């Protein structure tokens, strides 16, 4: 069973992070971009595939992805949509 919203909020809080929840519909996409901060992201429901210059990473419920500052990435939401929680570090 995937972690609940409360469990994921607690994980972020323990790391000193401020969680922000978001979701997208099936097939939604994010174009190539980067951030000036370290992004910490958990998938809570559905799936999303992050595309990087090093290859693709698919996240499913309970999976975590850390994206270092300056890393170029794009994303495609899976067939069931997605709900994620993320925060920035630094």
Which residue stretches match the model-derived regions?
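Short histidine-centered beta-strand/loop micro-motifs
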Residues: 9-11, 29-35, 51, 76-77
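Conserved short histidine dyad/triad with adjacent acidic residue
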Residues: 18-35, 69
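A generic "binding-loop/recognition-motif" signal
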Residues: 26, 36-37, 55, 71-72, ...
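Short, charged/polar surface micro-motifs in flexible loops or helix N-caps
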Residues: 26-27, 45-48, 90
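Short, conserved beta-strand element in jelly-roll/cupin
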Residues: 34-49
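Short acidic-glycine-tyrosine-enriched beta hairpin
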Residues: 53-69
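Ligand-binding loop in jelly-roll beta-barrel domains
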Residues: 70-90
